[in-house]
Amino acid sequence: MDHLPIFCQLRDRDCLIVGGGDVAERKARLLLDAGARLTVNALAFIPQFTAWADAGMLTLVEGPFDESLLDTCWLAIAATDDDALNQRVSEAAESRRIFCNVVDAPKAASFIMPSIIDRSPLMVAVSSGGTSPVLARLLREKLESLLPLHLGQVAKYAGQLRGRVKQQFATMGERRRFWEKLFVNDRLAQSLANNDQKAITETTEQLINEPLDHRGEVVLVGAGPGDAGLLTLKGLQQIQQADVVVYDRLVSDDIMNLIRRDADRVFVGKRAGYHCVPQEEINQILLREAQKGKRVVRLKGGDPFIFGRGGEELETLCNAGIPFSVVPGITAASGCSAYSGIPLTHRDYAQSVRLITGHLKTGGELDWENLAAEKQTLVFYMGLNQAATIQQKLIEYGMPGEMPVAIVENGTAVTQRVIDGTLTQLGELAQQMNSPSLIIIGRVVGLRDKLNWFSNH
């Protein structure tokens, strides 16, 4: 993060703009809207500045820039078309430890001005760090269309209710659930927009007096195979509303960065063949946090119901009467194959696909005869350590040794690595790869050279 986003309280504080043209005017509007006591210095001014000065909204100082203008300032903006003058203003401000923005020269500035969506008291700022103002503007326009104009009224009304809500609801969890109900209540929003005081009061009383469910809840969320862009919209919404996030090793750092900043994070460290936290203990963590009235997200790589033991976790919650829901994720088979240029099914090569766990332990034996059949694709999860056994068994039951195979490591991530070969090489190939990896076996692997798109990007 190159810049710390902050919102400055400038009401009745001295600010200086050096420049009297159109760019300076745009900056002046922002500072006036923020209530600043504004001085503008320039050799000449466009008419708007004169009109503001005549209305007593700001002070004009006509003439060359003098550093003494900064003596009482909280904040300054250099907005002239003279680069040398802008640099001089910046250096003079820096020597006085005054924040200074230099228009179109972010490297010379001690702060930058973001694009702003104003739904006061709700403010949203979008910045590209000065590298691409056009991109920031485009993002602002998209956000403008998503945020209702009356959102500011709802936020302001919420501020008026804070004292009462604090008295009414004892815990932070109860208050948060109340606020979530209020902010998504369309009737209240419309009543505020129409200034319908009767409807505002009725809706508010109904929301406050409705009994809250004191039980917490658990949401099982599939994080997808790695690329944060593959996280579903609903999954994103859930992790941003969570009080507690219980996650494992397969959840990428990019996805973890999307979690609510004040949420508790509990790492349970699961990976193929190794469990830092036993499954039963994970079940109890979910149960314990939910019983405290918290909203818990169990965040799993891929899809929670495909070799994720999500069903076992939900059985524990169900037996304890804890509400739960599931947000599916893109499973590793889909993500890794797509990012490797390997279609799992193909009219000419595979009419079915099988997802198989590579955990060949506790004496369990797979149906190798059916797995060795033609016209299908096999995807082995967590099969890296058993690759030699998989190779031996499939050949033993009749699969041709020249059957194409691929191993995908860190699928969909920027660190993705793929090697391919034939079934007779599978055990040897596996020794070159690290977990997490996925094994794909079938004729469709032969299409990889033609369809591989990700490595070219």
UniProtKB/Swiss-Prot annotation:
- Report residues binding S-adenosyl-L-methionine: 225, 301-303, 306, 331-332, 382, 411
GO BP annotations of the record are: cobalamin biosynthetic process; methylation; siroheme biosynthetic process
- Which residues of this protein are catalytic? 248, 270
Q: Which Gene3D superfamilies match?
A: Cobalt-precorrin-4 Transmethylase, Domain 1 (3.40.1010.10), Methyltransferase, Cobalt-precorrin-4 Transmethylase, Domain 2 (3.30.950.10), NAD(P)-binding Rossmann-like Domain (3.40.50.720), Sirohaem synthase, dimerisation domain (1.10.8.210), Siroheme synthase, domain 2 (3.30.160.110)
Span list, region Uroporphyrinogen-III C-methyltransferase: 216-457
Where is the region Precorrin-2 dehydrogenase /sirohydrochlorin ferrochelatase?
1-204
Which family is this protein grouped under?
A: In the N-terminal section; belongs to the precorrin-2 dehydrogenase / sirohydrochlorin ferrochelatase family. In the C-terminal section; belongs to the precorrin methyltransferase family.
Q: What does this protein do?
A: Then it catalyzes the NAD-dependent ring dehydrogenation of precorrin-2 to yield sirohydrochlorin. Finally, it catalyzes the ferrochelation of sirohydrochlorin to yield siroheme.
> Could you identify this protein by its name?
Siroheme synthase
Gene assigned in the entry:
cysG
